[in-house]
Amino acid sequence: KSYAEWMVRQQWQKWNVDAYFPMNYNDFYLRGPKWVGRVTREEVETAGGKPVYSGLFICHDWENKRGDIDPENSGLVPSEIAAAVQAAREAGAAGICLFCPSHMTEAHWAEFDKAIGLK
């Protein structure tokens, strides 16, 4: 089974969509940011030529992440952004989407800009 089918019971090969925006929440599966590449590669293969925009889950209170057990405070901290973006690109993602952009702090945006080549 694909990650999508195994993890969230989604059978993409049966969908008629223009693009995919999977929520690649590495922390939910106790994986580091490079896991995004592994799952994105499979998503690209499953998508049958349609674009995949790898969804990155952003930690909104990243300075207190280590002491918080709430899964809603999971996600990428600024220092992990570059590894996740690079892994998704190398795996064939057409782009990146952010869940949730409102969680992005100045530090997240600075690292994101570097990761996509704006700085």
Where are these regions (language model features)?
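Amphipathic alpha-helical interface segments
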Residues: 39
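Amphipathic coiled-coil/heptad-repeat helices and related helical stalk/stem segments
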Residues: 4-6, 36, 81
